Structure formats: C-alpha cells, structure tokens
Amino acid sequence: MRDRVRRSAVMLIVAAIVILIDQGTKTLALNTLRQDARIPLIGDWLGLQLAFNPGAIFSLGEGSTWVITVVGLAVTAALIGAATRARNVWSAVGFGFIVGGAIGNLIDRLFSPPAFGIGHVTDFLAYGNLFIGNLADVALGIGAVCLIVAGLRTSRRRPDPASRPDPVDPVPAEETVHP
C-alpha cells in the first residue's frame, strides 16, 4: 500500500511540474511570439512561432473542438485512474508526463478564447513545415516512451512460463534406496 501511495505521489508531482512548465511557456509564447513570424532555433527544422489549434494533433477535428474537449476530459480521468495503479516508478513517471500534458492542453480548451470548452490550444514549437506543437505535446511523447520502458523492464523480469523446467516429482518412499 505504501508503494502505491509513493508511486501516486510521483505521478502527481511529475504531472504538476509538467502543467506548470507547459502553462508558463504558453504564457511566454503568447507575450513574445507572433503568428506571422518564425524564430529559427535549429535551421528550418525547429523554431518558435505562435499558433492556435482548435483541433487535436495535426489540427484534426478542428470543427469539433467541444467533442475533443469532452473526450479529453474522459480520457484524462481514465488516465488518472490507471496511473493510481502504476506498478513501478517508471510507469508512475510516464503517467505523470501523460496526465500533465493532457491537463495542460485541457486547460487551454476549457479557458482560452474563443469560449469555455471550445478554446484553442496555444502552440509555439514549429517542427519544420510539419506542425506546430507545445510542451504538453512533448510531455505526452516522453510519457509514452517511459511507459514503453516500464513495460519492457517488467516483461524482462517475468520469466516465460514455457522456459521454466518441469517440476521434479519426488521419488515415492517405497522406491527410496537405503544404503
């Protein structure tokens, strides 16, 4: 029980840090960047440019922002429930990144213009000409990698039942040889 509480605390701390950093960088982006100008960081590969995303990843579903918000709330609640059952610290950290990223983007959907529940997510990390994202999106990716690592570590610890030797039957007492 104590380990479960510790892992839940790890998840909550990671999620809180992700939310704070995500919302802080979005505020900074809103105050310093423009939609019509890109600041290159690594050539044309990575830059800073303000964008507002009414949809999901790659702006999919941009006409259904309220649906994305409702689905996002449900998925986030399910993730928090799953996170409380994390089996190891890697899983707790992974769920923390994912929950923090999901909540970071939900805050935008709930409280950013144009209106409550249909707000646009603030994006500012321009990946070439592919898409523009934010640190919540990065946290979602990091969390997924952590969960994969946790799964690989767990599967390595569990021996394959097929590889276990058959149990040895004890020799019946009447067949025991006495010197």
Regions found by a protein language model. Give the residues of each.
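Alpha-helical transmembrane bundles and membrane-interface segments of multipass inner-membrane proteins
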Residues: M1-P179
